[in-house]
Structures are given as C-alpha cells and as structure tokens.
Amino acid sequence: MKKLICLFAVFLMLCGRAFALDANDLLPPEKAFVPELAVADDGVNVRFRIADGYYMYQAKIVGKTDPADLLGQPSFSKGEEKEDEFFGRQTVYHHEAQVAFPYAKAVGEPYKLVLTYQGCAEAGVCYPPVDTEFDISGNGTYHPQTDEPASAKDRFLQPSSQNGSGALPPPKGDEGGDSRFKLSWDTLNANLLAFFLAGLGLSFTACMYPLLPIVSSIVVGDKKAGKARAFVLSVVYVQGLSLTYTLVGIVAGLTGALLTVWLQQAWVVLAASALMVVLALSMFGLFNIQLPNAVQSYFQNQSSRLSGGKIVSVFIMGILSALIVGPCVAPPLAFALGYIGQTGDAVLGGLALYTLALGTGVPLIAIGTFGGHILPRAGDWMNAVKYAFGFILLAVAVYLATPHLPYYLVVALYTLLMLVPACMLLVNGRRQKRRPKAVAFALGGILLIGGAWFGWQGANGKTTALHHFLTLNPPAEAGKSSEHGKMFADTAALKAAMDTALKEHPDKPVVLDFYADWCISCKEMAAYTLNQPEVHQAVDMERFFQIDVTANTPEHQALLKEYGLFGPPGVFVVRSDGSRSEPLLGFVKADKFIEWYEQNR
C-alpha cells in the first residue's frame, strides 16, 4: 500500500511539471527532420526521415529551383489526416515522408534546389520553416560539395548544406496548397459528397428549366415505357450530361500545375477575385450569362431531332444539354474548376465534375421516372438558392484576395457577407408561410448574431475560431495593447519597450511570449489561455510582451537563438537583472499558466 501511495505521489509530481517542458529535450530541426535526395533523369525524389515524437506538414513541403520553374507539380506519399480547429484538416507525416518532384522541362545545366519544409514536436512546439539547399548537376546526378562519392545517382543522399535563413517564409497560400480546401485521394469521399451536394443545389436553380421539356420528351419517345424503362432512359440522359462535365474536370486536373504557378501572382489572384464578383452578380439576376439565342436554338433543334426512347439518342441528348445549360451554371462551375486545378490529377478532376453532374441530374431522373408532380413547386425558394450561391462566390472572392487587402477591410467584407443575407432572410421571411418563415428567421438570426460578433471581435483586434479558419489575424502593430498583451513584430522595438518597462519598475518582471501564425499551440494559447479573466488577474498584461515571428526574418531567428528556442511557443519571465526563467513550452491551460508564472515571477 505504501509503495502504491509513493508511486501515486511521484505521478502527481510529474503531472505538476508537465507544463514545464525542458527546451533541452527538443531536437534541433536538422536532426528532427532530415531530408535525403535521389536524382533521376525525370525528376527529383526526396525522402524525409522524421524523428520519433515529431511530425511534418505536407502542405509546407515546397521545392524551388534556381533557375526557376524547373519542377512540376509534386506527388506525395500517403500521410495521416490531422483535424485541427484552427487550420482545418491537415495531412501530416510521422517517421517518414516521400515527395517526387518531376521535371517540368528538360534539364541540361546544373541548378540549385531549395527545399522548404516545416514540422512540429508532439510536445507542442512548432519549428520555423527550414530551407535546405542542394547543388545538382544537369546530367541527373547530385553534385557533391563534400566527400560524397561520385556514384550518387539513384540513391538517397544527404544534403550539401542546411540553413534556417528564412529566405522562403511560409506564405499564407504556399505551393503546398491550403489543406482546408484540398481535393486529394486521402479525402476523396468527403470531397465527392461535397461536389454531389453542390450539384444537387444547382439543380434547383432556373438553369435547369431548359432541360425539363427534353427530359419529358425522352419518356414520351418510348410510348410503351413503364417506370423502370423511364428510369433507365433518364439515367442514360444524365450520363450523357455528366460526360461533358467529366471531360472539363479532366482538363482542369491536367492544367493544375499551370494554374498553381499563375495563382502565385498577385494580379492574377485579384483578377480571379474580380471575376468571382462578376459571376456572383449574375447569380443575383443583375445580368444573365447564357449562349446567344441562335446557338441555344441550334442545340435544342438538334436534340429534338433525335428520337426519344433509344439509348444512344438519349445519351447524345444529354451531351447536347450540357452545352445548353453550361453558361448558366458557369459561376459556380468556375469555382469548382479552380478548386480541382490544385490537384494536377486528371482522374480526380474527372471524378469531381462527374459527381457534380450526378447531383445536378437527380431531380431530372426523378422527373423522367415519376413525372414533374413529385418535385417541389417552383417559387421564390429557387431564387433563394441562386442568391446563396451568389454570396458563396462573393465569400470566395474575398478569401482569394485576403493576402492582398488590408486586414480591417477583409473583416468588414466578411461581416457584410453575413449581415446582408441575414437582413434579406428576416425581411423576406415575414411574407412566407409558417415553416419557411421559421427557417428564414432561424437562419437570419444565426447570421445576424454571428456577423455582428465576428465584426465586433475583428474590429477590436480579437479573434474567434472563424477568424482562424479564414486565416485572419490582426496586424501586429508595435506596442499595441490587446488581450494578449503588447504585440511586436520588430525585435528592436520589442527590446526597447521591455527595457523601458524594466527600468521604470525594476522590482516587477516582464513576460515575453513567442508567437507565430503557423504555430498551432500558439493559437491554442491565444484562444484558451491568454484571454482568460483569471490570467489577466494574475498577470499584468501591460507588462506582457508578445513577439510575432511569423515572417521568420534573420532578426527573429537571432532572437529565438538568444532565448534558446527552436520555434514558438515559448514564454519567459524576464527580470531587471537580466536573468530569465526557464521557458514555458507548448500549450497549457490557464491554471497551469498561472502556477508557472507564480513560481517564476
């Protein structure tokens, strides 16, 4: 019994020290993540050896060359899905990751390859982006700078040099793609379901009106058709419709690498955002996007000449029908194609658009099989569906342009995109019957409250989970006070402010917190610890200083090295005599944070 009590006491002591993670226990990034390279005639293969207790982000693995644009779209080994409330679903790797970079064009001269990658320790500390350089000869072999043997071709090689220069800081939308909006084989089922539901939503817009008489003629063409035969004919018609969309999806997938390169340029991104706005306005009925009447009439005449009731004829009708309604559904289709283009995968692109077309075809199959009486009656709700797509397109436009717009303008735009539809629902809902009125009031109320809260928090420099999801973070203004203390991005300004505070009150220490946008534990600390009332009661937030090292500049790296950190988060108590506490690493709850502060103040 005494032994059991002793063991339990030791366990409690260990738990009490859990928040005091020792920085010496962490590996430097060059040991936590070791890239190894193999060069072939058709590209470069990279293998990362990852230490136990660490993981890497797929989306942060980027390859660039000098001269530029030698590499095509990379392909990755299968990773693990990690759901994060701040960054969404992420693909991560433990133990090992493999990446293949194909050559985008013939390579005949030596070039430099720079790999940028990033990972975290399971203990809660994230490393800044690391750059590793390789000098590669143009004949498909690795050019050694050390004592590497000449027979380096077709085997994994150690890097020639590593540095943490931060020359390639993690952009908000880097080449790895935003994993919250990523179509991949790992998330295939969820993505296909989303495309199917989007197609189902499109089917309830006025775009589908021209197809209704065509579907009716399919069944009429076979006078002896029962419901089973009508069902088969309707399905064949939808397959023809789907074929056209599938081909478009394949093209989008094949041109994905080119699309990715273009979307790295600011003017292209802003032009795409403007196009989304124009397409959204068409969904609001300000103008119509459609084929010229003469072209529409030609296609309709061609389809009417085909005899209904025959499988081949019905299939061709479906193909022609896609050309009739294509311009009408162009706005949401443009967004879908941009989404698919990130994959560079023709099969995935074709599957996605095929599923979208199937969703669009469900009501058409129902009409062909059972007749139009089984579908809801046309009315204002169909316009509501179009308006919903319009607001979604406007939100996409803002999301694309976010890196190139001022923070407070983006907050204002997102707020309007919630408040305007809320007001429309509440005003128009008054004219509806009981059930539609209840739905309109419920949705309108949620959007109104959510939009007001989102705007208020954003205007005051505070963040919510939605701000994090949209990658919206208040700009770090030197010395600006917030619920997280005084924020700095410039290290010189930070040191000057800390020195002033310590000279004014030498008997009171200050707290220094290292933060970065790409650090999950930093987000958790901001959302669940540093904003708690009990923390503000225990800690003078006027003496709480936060340095934002998101940009990972040489000055940021020097400060991290000065404090013995590989990356954020890390919190220190700094005293006027120059001494400082051991760092608080990783995420801890408010009570543990206060306990640590009281022990080190």
UniProtKB/Swiss-Prot annotation:
One Pfam entry name: DsbD_N
Main enzyme class: oxidoreductase
Domain of life: Bacteria
Main location: membrane
Subcellular location: Cell inner membrane
Signal peptide boundaries: 1-20
E.C. no: 1.8.1.8
Disulfide bonds: 120-126, 207-328, 519-522
Name this protein carries in UniProt: Thiol:disulfide interchange protein DsbD
Lineage: Bacteria, Pseudomonadati, Pseudomonadota, Betaproteobacteria, Neisseriales
